[in-house]
């Protein structure tokens, strides 16, 4: 079905992951007083923006995708959806998504949505992904935007809680993406994409994965330590982050099956961020920590 082709180029898995994180950020900032309509429009609007970014990314990456085993059957590569049609579809999604955010949220939330979109489409997809080993680092910023948009839509401000979310989700993106780059090493090498394993080697990538997870674990603890979440979130953050770190350290064992290990690190990264997104949605503190407001 032609409709399915268009749905697939929006990358539904990415949309679902971002939907969970934006809802988590919104509920954390709402502190039990949830505006249902605002939440619905925020989640829907940002989901459309993310879908638009994914479609435009498919259009930009057609030449790269054609070289990779994982992506060579995408509709924009095979011609099942023309680039012109995909561009029209992607831009229409952007208009709808940003329209909803502008209509129902606030300038801070919209500003972060614009920032994430511009970084992902304009900076990461068009240039950094192809040219720099730091492409993953730049792309991590756009991946960290959804929970911040949700948080700012509900709170109307960018405070310490939003800053922690931005840092936490940016840090999470790095080992998550590096794990993918390891078990998809051949694809990235064939397409000449300078991800860290291809450009600097597996050993350096393993070290970066461990270091980023360690810092992520510390930053995740800042939400409960700063009074934004409670002990339940702290327990979930500690258990998931430390187990993820343990899994990463297993990569240094002798005779480790590299691809299997990388897939395990990747898989648990999704479990970790999903658990934390759900945790912060329900284990919020009813009274905001007023001393931590940075910008209001």
Swiss-Prot record:
The record's subcellular locations are: Cell inner membrane
Coiled-coil intervals, chain numbering: none
**What membrane topology is annotated for this entry?**
Multi-pass membrane protein
Could you say which residues form the signal peptide?
A: none
Q: Which UniProt keywords apply?
A: Cell inner membrane, Cell membrane, Heme biosynthesis, Membrane, Transferase, Transmembrane, Transmembrane helix
Disulphide bond pairs: none
Keyword Transferase assigned to the entry: answer is yes
Principal place of residence: membrane
Q: Which GO terms describe its molecular function?
A: protoheme IX farnesyltransferase activity
The record's catalysed reaction(s) read: heme b + (2E,6E)-farnesyl diphosphate + H2O = Fe(II)-heme o + diphosphate
Tell me its family. Belongs to the UbiA prenyltransferase family. Protoheme IX farnesyltransferase subfamily.
Q: What else is known?
A: Carbon 2 of the heme B porphyrin ring is defined according to the Fischer nomenclature.
Q: What is this protein called?
A: Protoheme IX farnesyltransferase 1
């Amino acid at each position: 079905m032609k409709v399915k082709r268009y749905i697939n180029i929006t990358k539904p898995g990415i949309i679902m992951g971002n939907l969970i994180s934006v809802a988590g950020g919104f509920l954390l900032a709402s502190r039990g007083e949830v505006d249902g309509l605002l939440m619905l429009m925020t989640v829907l609007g940002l989901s459309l923006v993310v879908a638009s970014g994914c479609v435009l990314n498919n259009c930009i990456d057609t030449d790269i995708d054609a070289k990779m085993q994982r992506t060579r059957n995408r509709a924009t590569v095979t011609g099942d959806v023309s680039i012109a049609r995909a561009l029209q579809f992607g831009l229409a999604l952007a208009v709808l998504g940003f329209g909803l955010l502008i209509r129902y949220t606030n300038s801070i939330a919209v500003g972060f949505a614009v920032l994430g979109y511009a970084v992902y489409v304009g900076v990461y997809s068009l240039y950094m992904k192809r040219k720099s080993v730091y492409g993953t680092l730049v792309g991590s910023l756009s991946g960290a935007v959804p929970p911040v948009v949700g948080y700012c839509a509900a709170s109307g401000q960018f405070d310490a809680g939003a800053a922690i979310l931005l840092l936490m989700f940016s840090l999470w993106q790095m080992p998550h993406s590096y794990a993918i780059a390891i078990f998809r090493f051949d694809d990235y090498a064939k397409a000449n994409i300078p991800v860290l394993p291809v450009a600097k080697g597996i050993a350096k990538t393993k070290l970066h994965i461990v270091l980023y997870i360690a810092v992520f674990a510390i930053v995740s603890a800042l939400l409960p330590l700063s009074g934004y979440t409670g002990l339940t979130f702290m327990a979930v953050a500690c258990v998931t982050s430390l187990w993820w770190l343990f899994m990463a350290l297993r990569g240094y064992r002798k005779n480790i099956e590299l691809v299997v290990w990388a897939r395990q690190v990747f898989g648990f990264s999704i479990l970790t961020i999903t658990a934390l997104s759900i945790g912060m949605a329900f284990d919020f503190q009813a009274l905001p920590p007023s001393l931590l407001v940075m910008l209001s």
